[in-house]
Amino acid sequence: MQPLAEVTLTRPWHWGIAVVGNPVAEVPTDFGGRLVAVGQDVVALSVRHAQDIEADKFEGDWDWATATLHVRSLVQEEVTDRRVLCDTVVATPQETVSLGDADGMVVIPAPSLRTRLIISSDDVDPTGLERVWVDLVAVDG
């Protein structure tokens, strides 16, 4: 099924955390040994830290480590073989979801006023996720 919208974001995450949900919600900080922390209308992900590399300079700047987040806005849930790390519903009254960290946010269309976030990964590393899929699914009612 074709997504309503799809965004892939690959970049260094200098805080080691990616935030998905309401951009003004209080970001959860207690991961309790997990890779995902769920708050009110927001989810925080422990992603590969930008400094998780051998320290090499490239053209006068650091060659930072990156993590990639694939975000899809879907009409209905799709079955996946990836490990599901989180399945929660957030309020999206503006019909948008923000993805980012303190360095910047990207706004993505949400499929409804309440959105189910299904977060999965095919490579779950306890030091931080390197590839993450975030499916946004409309919640009826």
Locate each region found by the language model.
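Primarily secretory-pathway and cell-envelope proteins
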Residues: 1-79, 125-141
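Extended, solvent-exposed segments with strong compositional bias
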Residues: 75-103
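Generic hydrophobic secondary-structure signal
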Residues: 97, 119, 134-136
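A short tyrosine-centered beta-strand micro-motif
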Residues: 113-117
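Short beta-strand-plus-loop segments that form exposed binding edges in beta-rich domains
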Residues: 120-124
